[in-house]
Amino acid sequence: MDDNKKKALAAALGQIERQFGKGAVMRMGDHDRQAIPAISTGSLGLDIALGIGGLPKGRIVEIYGPESSGKTTLTLSVIAQAQKAGATCAFVDAEHALDPEYAGKLGVNVDDLLVSQPDTGEQALEITDMLVRSNAVDVIIVDSVAALVPKAEIEGEMGDMHVGLQARLMSQALRKITGNIKNANCLVIFINQIRMKIGVMFGSPETTTGGNALKFYASVRLDIRRTGAVKEGDEVVGSETRVKIVKNKVAPPFRQAEFQILYGKGIYLNGEIIDLGVLHGFLEKSGAWYSYQGNKIGQGKANSAKFLQDNPEIGNALEKQIREKLLTASPDVKANPVKETEDDMADADI
């Protein structure tokens, strides 16, 4: 750059700083790059698949899936992990369906959890914005986008048509709160439901509610599905769950993680530690026996997981070793790598 351009740029930067404040424009090389802070999801495999060890702070995240797929359970697990780290969390319960007893079983400190059950979608999003701007809340869950009913729809007759009203509400709200979320370094998670598009011949007929704005503003989008049942004898005690990362602005997308959700207990973390420990050589498996550093810890996965539960120092050490290996490794290392297909690209457009 010649001297005249340098002088012109310096004058422009000086004027911008005087008018808009210091830091309004800066060179990226002037400051050290810092890793994006993350909050664990409570699932080791999902944290690894996300690439940064959890969900990114200061960003919007969307979690969507069919009914009873584990959406609320996953978000309550995020709250439990955040509270363990001393964070303040809020739950905007637009569905009016939050069960404090169930949340407590998943490790949530319900006494410290901020809960709102708004009457309208406008009220829910205004409360969310005010909590973000307080700079005092670290995690906010909005459950769910489909339940953010515009005031005009609530006050109108049952059969009235309100085309695009909810989509416009979401678009306006997200424009308003996105910058505040970044400044407050707050993680905002929107839970969303799935609807079917009529007349789709090719590609996925599934779509999410609330228009397209959330798809653009979300830094991470998670598609969560129930893939099977966990049984003890004939009794169903949990569900096999698969989470696919269909959008990720902070790490490579299209990774996936599989884990179990046990009813009344939440994500089966110790089971994940056993599986990933064997896969990456931290645990030895001989027949049905599992060993750690030459010492047998249990016969069968269930007994070995119970050993880790009874000996949390060993479980924590194993989890730390797995995280250090997989989260500091090259981008090619994945929790559950999947080959990108046309269906994946269709999912990304949901």
UniProtKB/Swiss-Prot annotation:
UniProt organism field: Pseudomonas fluorescens (strain ATCC BAA-477 / NRRL B-23932 / Pf-5)
Start and end residues of each stretch annotated as Disordered: 329-350
Keywords on record: ATP-binding, Cytoplasm, DNA damage, DNA recombination, DNA repair, DNA-binding, Nucleotide-binding, SOS response
Highest taxon of source: Bacteria
BP term (GO), one: SOS response
Role noted for this protein: Can catalyze the hydrolysis of ATP in the presence of single-stranded DNA, the ATP-dependent uptake of single-stranded DNA by duplex DNA, and the ATP-dependent hybridization of homologous single-stranded DNAs. It interacts with LexA causing its activation and leading to its autocatalytic cleavage.
Tagged with keyword Ubl conjugation: no
Name this polypeptide is given: Protein RecA
